[in-house]
């Protein structure tokens, strides 16, 4: 039995290839069935995200194994083999175990240490268990990777600092406001970055969210997900006074929030402070707003300096995490080798018990027929000894004939001979 990990990711393949190799959720069961129909595959898990598609497999070793699996992947997705080969990586046994642990821990992610990948790995594993998981070693490898990822998060600071613009914006808000459960947040825009911001804020139980966007339909989809109110961009001037925090990210070529607008809002708020985080390029908030008393304006450049500092901290934590992964990989491989030995021990014991039962039955039958008890017992002992030492004796003789002293010494050691 061999453990394999093969696939492509953001480091080895462009998005144009990654999207062609991805497995859609509605066809995943079909893909797993097709994969497990391959004669060499004992068990499989398919991990498919926007940044990676990977197969984790338990296989029987055979000639041209790599060729067969690449051919299956290309046939399934109707790909040219040469296009895939240039981007494909292949890990076996120790390297496959280490790779999965690194992936689950966020060490192989586009954003170092990002936590979402662990949930994606867990879902891929759960999907594989719907009648597809047939290899206990593969199952154990995934369970181990989950505990390793948890250990990495607990024992290092890999996830402690914000390294995305969206997360950095939310982190800044949490640093300035003691609790988000008492604040109102105005989000301007409804693109991917604002979506991430909204989800982070929901996780931290913000009191109220308002989403202002050019098109109401797009904003409404996000609002329904996070429990927010939707307003038009033209309503911002009137509603700005309600917001303790404003986070803006649109594609507008001109500022949406001007100095006069913020001045009016501050006056209505009786100069209660406002945090404005402008993560748009070009800027959504006029720079002059930052000169107003009680208006604290941060631009995307301010966030990038926070991110750069935090990324350096994550890289330092990643060194500690890699040490944990190396240790846990070694322990898992020791367990795996022990499992192989356990199967051999079970077979050897079963064989010995079969010989014992066969000869004992013959001896008991002879006793029932009135045979001499002492002679029967001596015959049993002699036959049992000969049957048990027959195979080791043949191996010793063959090693001697071959002049294989190393094998002779291994056999002597295995038989407990001085």
Curated annotation (Swiss-Prot):
It catalyses: (S)-4-amino-5-oxopentanoate + tRNA(Glu) + NADP(+) = L-glutamyl-tRNA(Glu) + NADPH + H(+). InterPro entries: 4pyrrol_synth_GluRdtase (IPR000343), 4pyrrol_synth_GluRdtase_dimer (IPR015896), 4pyrrol_synth_GluRdtase_N (IPR015895), GluRdtase_CS (IPR018214), GluRdtase_dimer_dom_sf (IPR036453), GluRdtase_N_sf (IPR036343), NAD(P)-bd_dom_sf (IPR036291), Shikm_DH/Glu-tRNA_Rdtase (IPR006151). GO terms for biological process: protoporphyrinogen IX biosynthetic process from glutamate. Pathway: Porphyrin-containing compound metabolism; protoporphyrin-IX biosynthesis; 5-aminolevulinate from L-glutamyl-tRNA(Glu): step 1/2. CDD domains: NAD_bind_Glutamyl_tRNA_reduct. It is an enzyme of class 1 (oxidoreductase). It comes from the Bacteria. The record marks 99 as: Important for activity. Keywords: NADP, Oxidoreductase, Porphyrin biosynthesis. The active site is at residue 50. NADP(+) binds at residues 189-194. GO terms for molecular function: glutamyl-tRNA reductase activity; NADP binding. Substrate binds at residues 49-52, 109, 114-116, 120. Its EC number is 1.2.1.70. Catalyzes the NADPH-dependent reduction of glutamyl-tRNA(Glu) to glutamate 1-semialdehyde (GSA). Possesses an unusual extended V-shaped dimeric structure with each monomer consisting of three distinct domains arranged along a curved 'spinal' alpha-helix. The N-terminal catalytic domain specifically recognizes the glutamate moiety of the substrate. The second domain is the NADPH-binding domain, and the third C-terminal domain is responsible for dimerization. Homodimer. NCBIfam families: hemA. This is Glutamyl-tRNA reductase.
């Amino acid at each position: 039995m061999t453990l394999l990990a093969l696939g492509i990711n953001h480091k080895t393949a462009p998005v144009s290839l990654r999207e062609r190799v991805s497995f859609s959720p509605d066809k995943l069961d079909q893909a797993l069935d097709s994969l497990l129909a391959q004669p060499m595959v004992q068990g499989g898990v398919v991990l498919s995200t926007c940044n990676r598609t990977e197969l984790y497999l338990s296989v029987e070793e055979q000639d041209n194994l790599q060729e067969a699996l690449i051919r299956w992947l290309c046939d399934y997705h109707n790909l040219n083999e040469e296009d895939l080969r240039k981007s494909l990586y292949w890990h076996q046994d120790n390297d496959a175990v280490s790779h999965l642990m690194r992936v689950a821990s966020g060490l192989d992610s586009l954003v170092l240490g990002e936590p979402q990948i662990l949930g994606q790995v867990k879902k891929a594993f759960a999907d594989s268990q719907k009648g597809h998981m047939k290899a206990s070693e593969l199952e154990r490898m995934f369970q181990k990777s989950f505990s390793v990822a948890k250990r990495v998060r607990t024992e290092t600071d890999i996830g402690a600092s914000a390294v995305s613009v969206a997360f950095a914006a939310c982190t800044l808000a949490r640093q300035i406001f003691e609790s988000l459960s008492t604040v109102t947040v105005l989000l301007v825009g409804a693109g991917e970055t604002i979506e991430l911001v909204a989800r982070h804020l929901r996780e931290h139980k913000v009191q109220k969210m308002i989403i202002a966007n050019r098109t109401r339909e797009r904003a409404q989809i996000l609002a329904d997900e996070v429990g927010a109110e939707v307003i038009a961009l033209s309503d911002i001037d009137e509603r700005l006074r309600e917001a303790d925090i404003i986070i803006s990210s649109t594609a507008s070529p001109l500022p949406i929030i001007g100095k006069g607008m913020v001045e009016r809002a501050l006056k209505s708020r009786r100069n209660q402070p406002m945090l404005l985080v402008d993560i748009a390029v070009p800027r959504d908030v006029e720079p002059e707003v930052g000169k107003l008393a009680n208006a604290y304006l941060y631009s995307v450049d301010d966030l990038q300096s926070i991110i750069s500092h935090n990324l350096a901290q994550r890289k330092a934590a990643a060194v500690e995490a890699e040490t944990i992964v190396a240790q846990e990989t070694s322990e898992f491989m020791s367990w795996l080798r022990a499992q192989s030995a356990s199967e051999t021990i079970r077979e050897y014991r079963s064989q010995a018990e079969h010989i014992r039962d066969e000869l004992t039955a013959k001896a008991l039958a002879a006793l029932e027929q009135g045979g001499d008890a002492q002679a029967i017992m001596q015959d049993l002992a002699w036959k049992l000894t000969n049957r048990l030492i027959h195979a080791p004796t043949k191996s010793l003789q063959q090693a001697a004939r071959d002049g294989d002293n190393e094998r002779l010494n291994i056999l002597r050691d295995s038989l407990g001979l001085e």
